[in-house]
Amino acid sequence: MIGKTNALSAAGVELSLVVSVTSGAAVTATKSGKTVTGTATGGSCVLKLPEAGTWSVSATLNGQTSNTQSVSVKDSYAVSLTFFSATITVTVDSGASVALKKDGATVQTKTSTGTAVFTVTETGTYTIIATKSGQSVSGTVNVVSSTTTYALTLSFVSSTLNNNEWSVIKSVSDAGQGASYWSIGDRKAATLNGTVGALTLSNVTTYAFIIGFNHNASVEGANRIHFQLGKTALSGGTDVALCDSKYNSQVSATGYFSMNSSATNSGGWNSSQMRTKICGTSLSSYSGTIIAVIPAALRAVLKSVTKYTNNTGNSSAASAVTATTDYFFLLSEYEVFGSTTYANSNEASKQAQYSYYSAGNSKVKYNHSATSTAVRWWLRSPRAGSSAAFVIVGTDGTVGGRNAFYSLGFAPGFCV
């Protein structure tokens, strides 16, 4: 604020410039090579100016420079100067050492009490690094305004998979370090809400479980943790597949958990209604698919995966095995059993058995809404010697086949 006083200038009379600024600040006024300085006490500094005219006024304190005011002094004037100040609140585990850095240099260090609050005196990008028990996490904050309060949450990795946010799981996956923290079969809760195909789910909590770390990475993509849905509990419980009201029945409409609406495997996995309408192929348009019913936090960290499958259908040719890019996918015969009985045997050259199943874990799954009832569940591999069927896992956990228009159990995989 600049204010004019009632004092009048006269020849040989000094003009007063009253500067309101933080106590201890060094105040400087300059004009055409002339400089007047002073130090603020009690929140202000009075400068005696030798002449009228336009003066530039600024202040410094603890290495910080205030805004600069340009004042046209004819009489005596008052001006206010402010220093830039913004707050960054970091939420992180109590006891963590939190360092604030800018341009590679450490600006401040604090110990978190659940939060660590930093006051910064200039704009720019700040890096915050929290360290506890030998583990470090970091994030950045871009400070552009003194009127904004900035916040950052940092999370350490827990060795209990379910205690981690999906974003933390992704960061571990990005670094290719999943196996350093967790084990095959570890579980993470996911609450399903909405409609997938013809099945409406309301607050149904299932547990996604890890089936592979960097599985078949040279083909499918590196730095991925592979999961499958789902189990009924964080420990113990039952392996389940989602089943709609037409389970084990023939259906002639799309939208049920059938591979197709007719008894055909033409076009294989790539063209199946299971892939396009139930699993979904896009993160921007996914209404009615499994992508629509998973938590938003999981949807935000999904990674695409390259899957090779017989995408012709009734074929044993190597050329029939081609790639698709998927977010949710059915497992193949080889990925579950480590061998091919009904699928095109050339699929095996582009696939690998998932660690979860190679370890001998059960392949039997139960109806998610009737957990004492074992169900058949779909695999994405077409039966190579049939124009009508895809491969399935039977109620006893053995491999089989079923015509594509049957609605069966849905137990998809995905990657983070």
Model-derived features with residue positions:
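A short, amphipathic beta-strand motif
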Residues: 13-23, 86-92
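Collagenous Gly-X-Y triple-helix signature in extracellular proteins
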Residues: 157-416
